[in-house]
Design a protein with these regions (language model features):
Chain A
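Active-site cofactor/cluster-binding pocket
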Residues: 1-176
Length: 176, 386
């Protein structure tokens, strides 16, 4: 079987949970099914709240050796609309937390802030956008995502984050 | 066995938990901090029955580890970068005292300029400290070496401290698939530590003594031979590891596509995997590319290097350090090993990843392309500011 690899870059600000989302998605894929591999890592360095940060997830049907940063992502996920450069991505699809329809090729908007505010009570959109991503990637259905949430989030946060993830996943899946 | 998705630091902490050290003494430093945090949590939660000793510095961390090992128990410590350099005075004490301490080092840049990111300048500067030095490629190997290192270090023919190096951030902070063994499996592989090299009221011995000009060489020779003996201990330990855990390791080095390779990258640590990916890609185009991964820098695998590179036409040693005024430490050692071995390859040195600089697929591809011209220089990747 030829290797299938999907590479994701997460764009967020310190405190928005970009790396947590990168880990949830990696764990969901790696632990959800046999023969699946993932790698998740942040843009390394000191953590500063509010500063732009990136995180990376690689998913594959073969073991992953390349630990370098993702330069040609299949998906770019923007947790913070202010970080989106408002142009079509050079590679892959951009998934943007925004209520605005940008009308750009390869850009999909989803109002994650609204959904997070209404269901979580805070505008933290990392798990919402993980659910949005899940609707595009085989192996990241809500059942797999729940494995990722269990692996990466403390018990008190799991239920509501899983609920918001499933909601985002199903809303996106309907639109596709 | 439990499937997990954890970082290199977390994987290593799991391996140490399973190895049951009686004492953990450590001082936190980025990017090592998480392994120590996890172990302290395990001790607090009762998952690990160990004395976790908060010390005030790395010098004290190693001094404490030496004291505990001299009391006859299994010990663990961990450090990185400036911390390793601060404990440098104590490293030969541990080695000369023949205390089989296991230490994880998170490979990191050395100041100045101040930099918390990964490279191999710290550990490779301590190559002559008397410690076995191992460089892990991924989190699974790191975890497995947390367990295997004690078997090798504590073997009575070896009795030498063991440093397991994990590339800072690229390995310590990257989350990936790991199989965590069961305690029963590890207990059947790794017996409790027993030694006569200890403070014992029933059989008192002189420890930590002076040896003047007449006898000093005998102790140093014995230390040298003990370290060399590890080369004979590693293969049977890996065979037994394979029988119990089902994972096969390749001894002092790991060769990838070397049988007929003409262009070879020699490297160490987690960038090795990327080099293997690139070699695989080049093979599709008929380029005879290969990779030699140095797993152990000490004891140095000179015989393995000689036989692996015998038919190579051009070799690049890729490493994340420089010995200022000369070349990379690994390059010098590889060249030295090849002298008189019959290898007629051209050999160059590429110093990359300093201060955490990303090493990409294209960087490695460019090295292989360059090898067609049989370069012999020492060069830096990223050396021309762009």
């Amino acid at each position: 079987m030829t290797e299938k690899r999907i590479e994701i870059v997460w764009h967020g600000r310190g405190g928005q949970g970009a790396f947590t989302a990168a880990r949830i998605v990696g764990a969901a894929y790696a632990l959800g099914k046999e023969g699946r591999y993932a790698m998740s890592f942040p843009s390394f360095g000191p953590e500063r709240r509010g500063a732009p940060v990136r995180a990376f997830t690689k998913l594959s049907t073969a073991p992953i050796n390349d630990r370098s940063q993702v330069s040609h992502p299949d998906f770019s996920v923007y947790l913070d609309e202010g970080l989106f450069p408002r142009r079509s991505p050079a590679s892959g699809i951009a998934l943007v937390n925004s209520k605005e329809d940008f009308g750009l090729d390869g850009v999909v908007s989803f109002d994650a802030s609204r959904l997070a505010q209404s269901m979580l009570g805070v505008p933290i959109t990392n798990t919402v956008m993980a659910g949005v991503l899940g609707s595009f990637v085989e192996g990241l259905d809500p059942q797999a995502l729940s494995v990722g949430v269990d692996a990466c989030m403390p018990p008190r946060l799991r239920q509501k984050n899983l609920a918001v993830m499933e909601k985002a996943y199903s809303e996106m899946a309907v639109g596709q | 066995m439990t499937k997990a998705f954890v970082s290199g630091n977390e994987a290593f902490a799991q391996g140490i938990r399973l190895a049951r050290p009686a004492v953990v003494s450590a001082y936190p430093i980025t990017p090592q901090t998480v392994v120590v945090e996890r172990l302290s949590e395990m001790v607090a939660d009762g998952e690990l029955d160990s004395n976790f000793i908060h010390v005030e510095s790395e010098h004290s961390a190693m001094s404490c580890a030496i004291g505990a090992s001299a009391a006859g128990v299994r010990v663990f410590t961990a450090t990185s970068s400036q911390g390793l350099l601060y404990m440098a005075e104590c490293l030969p004490y541990a080695a000369g005292g023949r205390f089989p301490i296991v230490m994880m080092n998170a490979d990191r840049s050395v100041a100045l300029p101040w930099n918390i990111y990964g490279d191999q300048s710290d550990s490779l500067s301590q190559i002559s400290s008397g410690w076995i030095q191992f460089y892990a490629m991924n989190a699974q190997e790191a975890l497995d070496m947390a367990i295997m290192s004690y078997r090798i270090a504590e073997d009575h023919r070896v009795s030498t401290p063991f440093m397991v190096n994990l590339d800072g951030f690229n390995l310590t902070h990257t989350y990936e698939n790991v199989d965590v063994p069961d305690q029963e499996q590890v207990d059947s592989f790794l017996p409790p530590y027993s030694t006569t090299n200890k403070i014992d009221l029933e059989k008192p011995v002189n420890m930590g003594f002076t040896a003047g000009p007449a006898y000093n060489v005998l102790f140093k020779m014995s230390e040298h031979m003990g370290m060399l003996n590890a080369r004979d201990v590693v293969p049977p330990v890996e065979d037994e590891f394979m029988r119990i855990f089902g994972r096969r390791y390749s001894g002092m080095v790991e060769g990838h596509l070397l049988e007929d390779a003409e262009l070879v990258i020699v490297t160490l640590g987690c960038v090795s995997g990327l080099c293997m990916d690139v070699a695989d890609r080049l093979r599709e185009d008929g380029v005879k590319a290969g990779v030699l991964r140095i797993r152990y820098m000490r004891p140095f695998p000179d015989r393995e290097v000689q036989s692996a590179l015998l038919n190579a036409k051009a070799v690049c040693v890729l490493e994340k350090d420089v010995s200022f005024g000369n070349a990379g430490v690994v390059f010098s050692e590889i060249k030295s090993a090849l002298y008189g071995s019959g290898c007629s390859c051209a050999i160059c040195n590429r110093i990359a990843g300093l201060g955490g600089r990303d090493i990409s697929f294209d960087d490695i591809l460019a090295i292989f392309e360059e090898l067609e011209n049989r370069p012999t220089d020492v060069g830096f990747i990223g050396g021309s500011a762009s």
